[in-house]
Design a protein with these regions (language model features):
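Short, compositionally biased
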Residues: 126-149
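Glycine- and charge-enriched low-complexity intrinsically disordered segments
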Residues: 146-161
């Protein structure tokens, strides 16, 4: 078991010990993505407040890198940078837009989201949901500063969890 924990710790960079800790440390993440420069330790990941980025959620595991953080790189075309506390209304809205986040997809290790789960949402999708009155609350400390390229800070602050 310790070898498997070590593998995950080295794969993810740090153990996920955020508010929704991933309890099944023996299960490997189902998706691998190239490591960004910032995730390789050459520069710190910052949140929209200019502070170090904190874990968004690990139950279920979230983030482009599936390490619990809402951080991105050039390969993430969706820009999964906004840490949200998903609501029933947002899950219904997302499904109506063609992105069903509530239905489990076991083939991808995805359990489906429930209201209250913390999830990294694409910045353009969050802005679209905001414009339609359906944006979920945002955890500013866990939202990557790159989200500011799409969403004004004032909107994020007005919708802070």
């Amino acid at each position: 078991m310790l070898a498997r924990i070590g593998w995950i710790t080295s794969f993810l960079g740090v153990p996920c010990n955020g508010p929704n800790h991933w309890p099944d440390l023996g299960r490997r993440p189902s998706v691998r993505h190239p490591v960004s420069e910032s995730s390789a330790g050459t520069s710190p990941d910052l949140n929209v407040l200019g502070q170090p980025l904190v874990v968004c959620g690990c139950q279920p595991m979230t983030g482009w890198f599936r390490d619990g953080h809402c951080r991105t790189n050039a390969a993430d075309l969706g820009r999964h940078s906004v840490c949200c506390v998903v609501t029933e209304a947002f899950l219904r809205y997302s499904q109506a837009q063609g992105n069903d986040l509530s239905t489990p997809a076991p083939a991808y290790g995805f359990p489906g989201l429930r209201p209250g789960d913390h999830w990294c949402v694409c910045a353009p999708r969050w802005l679209e949901a905001y414009e339609d009155g359906m944006a979920p609350p945002v955890r500013l400390e866990a939202t990557e500063d790159s989200a500011l390229e799409v969403i004004p800070l004032a909107l994020l602050q007005a919708n802070a969890a």
